[in-house]
């Protein structure tokens, strides 16, 4: 839809895909960058975008947790999205290293970056 690759879903100028495979945060982020130019773990910039991800992920993953691009993985104590977009919308519960989002409600939880979770990739629509 809207020029996304087959299997990807369009929302507000970006393409999204849920991956039903577990990886560490770093491996999931690397995987997303390899899927599509400009790809990263999903970042959120509105509650509507979170709702879109929940609608996309919950039928595939049921109740689960997915890695999102929020971390301080590369920036000591500086929080930011892995796609470089500034942190303008927050829904977190606490504050350590990497974050997962629930697939059933708009809540983010911190988890050790070395744990493995399923994930959602996001990319700009390819030109």
Curated annotation (Swiss-Prot):
> Origin, by domain of life?
Eukaryota
List, alphabetically, the PANTHER family matched: MANNOSE, PHOSPHOLIPASE, LECTIN RECEPTOR RELATED
> What is the protein named?
Snaclec macrovipecetin subunit beta
Described by its record, this protein's role is as follows: Interferes with one step of hemostasis (modulation of platelet aggregation, or coagulation cascade, for example).
Q: In which tissues is it expressed?
A: Expressed by the venom gland.
Q: Recall the GO molecular function terms of this protein's record.
A: toxin activity
Q: Which SUPFAM superfamilies match?
A: C-type lectin-like (SSF56436)
GO CC annotations on file: extracellular region
Annotated compartments? Secreted
A Pfam family it matches: Lectin_C
Family as reported in the entry's similarity comment: Belongs to the snaclec family.
Its assembly, as annotated, is: Heterodimer of subunits alpha and beta; disulfide-linked.
Predominant place of localization: secreted
Provide the alphabetized UniProt keywords: Disulfide bond, Hemostasis impairing toxin, Secreted, Toxin
Fetch the InterPro entries from UniProt.
C-type_lectin-like, C-type_lectin-like/link_sf, C-type_lectin/snaclec_domain, CTDL_fold
Q: Identify the residues that the record assigns to the C-type lectin domain, covering every copy.
A: 11-122
Disulfide connectivity?
4-15, 32-121, 98-113
Output the SMART domains linked to this UniProt entry. Answer: CLECT (SM00034)
């Amino acid at each position: 839809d809207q020029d996304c690759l087959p299997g990807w879903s369009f929302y507000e100028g970006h393409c999204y895909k849920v991956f039903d495979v577990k990886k560490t945060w770093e491996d999931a982020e690397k995987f997303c960058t390899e899927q599509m130019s400009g790809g990263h773990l999903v970042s959120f910039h509105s509650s509507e975008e979170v709702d879109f991800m929940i609608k996309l992920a919950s039928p595939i993953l049921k109740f689960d947790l997915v890695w999102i691009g929020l971390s301080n993985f590369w920036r000591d104590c500086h929080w930011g999205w892995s796609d470089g977009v500034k942190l303008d919308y927050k829904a977190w519960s606490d504050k350590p290293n990497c974050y997962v989002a629930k697939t059933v409600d708009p809540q983010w939880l911190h988890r050790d970056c070395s744990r493995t979770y399923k994930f959602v990739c996001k990319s700009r629509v390819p030109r």
